Structures are given as structure tokens and as C-alpha cells.
């Protein structure tokens, strides 16, 4: 879903950057706070960043100006919550834009909103609702799948808003649905596979009996 450099009109690029900035700053503060509370969390944050980086770098061609790939942020949001996920996803997206030409600087805000903010927040909300009624692995699976699919839905809306099929809200929706239809071909199976992987990883981490994991209340 990385929208490539220069693809969005300047006004949309600026709008998404302004929308993402305060949340990313708050996420940075939250990340610093949890690391200060327990230095061991730093290693877990680093592992989470690596997980997101590796999965989101596995890109497949999709809609013009974008790509299709796992996001990795579903696992991260289960571990740390939406704010920290927004900040860590920004680190990954910035690194990929600068060094891998994956995404872009002008489109960083839009990509952060989709992959780092709205997608993970939807997954985290679902996790919070269903966790009391199901196992940790099942809840994580659902969170990761919804995070992935929502990320691509948001990207479709971003592209639809930037390149509407005409004038008015209806034209934006029609264009967004066209983008979403193309994403669906690859992203439905990718999202399910990502959910399975995230559930396996969270299960493995909790079976280690890590005090750091327990301190994050993931296993609660």
C-alpha cells in the first residue's frame, strides 16, 4: 500500500502529513515512556520494527502508484497499542522511503495514516473487544487481519480522494471502490496469511514466559 513518491497531489500530501504528525509525536513520547519504565522493552520494540520492516518490504505490484504486501503492524499494535505503533511504523516507512525507494517522503504522511494509524487502531479495537471471549492467538489473528485489510481500505480511499472519477463525493467513492477491488485480489489472502503468522509469533512469545511480555499485559 506504499503510495510512491510524488504520486499524490501536493494538497493531499500536505493534508495527510498534518493529520499524521501529532499522533506520531505522541507515539514517540509513549515509546520513550515505556522504554524508560522497563529497558528490556527496547529489544521488543526493535524486534517489532524489524517484523514490520521485513513483512512490509515483501511487495507485489498492484494499483498504479502503490503496492500490495503484508503490513506487520497488527502484531505490533497487540504488543504496544496504537500510539507506539504509529511511531514505529513511521520509522519503518521513513527508512524504506529513503533507502529502498519504497513509498516516498511526500507521501509519508498518507502511508503513516493508513499503515501506522487507522489500520492498527481498527485492529487494536477489535482485539480489545474480542480478547475476553477468545484465546490470545485467535484475538491476535483477527486483529492482524483487520489491521491489514483496513490499511488497504484507507489507501483506496486516499487514492480515490486524490484521483476521483469526476466531481463530488460519489466520484470519490466510485474511484476508491475501483482501487479497493484491485487490492482485494491480492490482499484478502495476504491478510489471512499475515494473521496466521502474527498469531504464531504472539503465541511463541508468550510461551517463553517473558516478564517483559507480561508487563505489557498482552497475555492478560
UniProtKB/Swiss-Prot annotation:
GO terms for cellular component: ATP-binding cassette (ABC) transporter complex. It is found in: Cell membrane. HAMAP family: CbiM. GO terms for biological process: cobalamin biosynthetic process. The chain crosses the membrane at residues 6-26, 43-63, 74-94, 98-118, 182-202. Its main location: membrane. Keywords: Cell membrane, Cobalamin biosynthesis, Cobalt, Cobalt transport, Ion transport, Membrane, Transmembrane, Transmembrane helix, Transport. It comes from the Archaea. Pathway: Cofactor biosynthesis; adenosylcobalamin biosynthesis. Forms an energy-coupling factor (ECF) transporter complex composed of an ATP-binding protein (A component, CbiO), a transmembrane protein (T component, CbiQ) and 2 possible substrate-capture proteins (S components, CbiM and CbiN) of unknown stoichimetry. Belongs to the CbiM family. It holds the Pfam family CbiM. This is Putative cobalt transport protein CbiM. GO terms for molecular function: cobalt ion transmembrane transporter activity. PANTHER family: COBALT TRANSPORT PROTEIN CBIM, PTHR43627. Part of the energy-coupling factor (ECF) transporter complex CbiMNOQ involved in cobalt import. It is a multi-pass membrane protein. The keyword Transmembrane helix applies. InterPro entries: CbiM, CbiM/NikMN. The keyword Cell membrane applies.
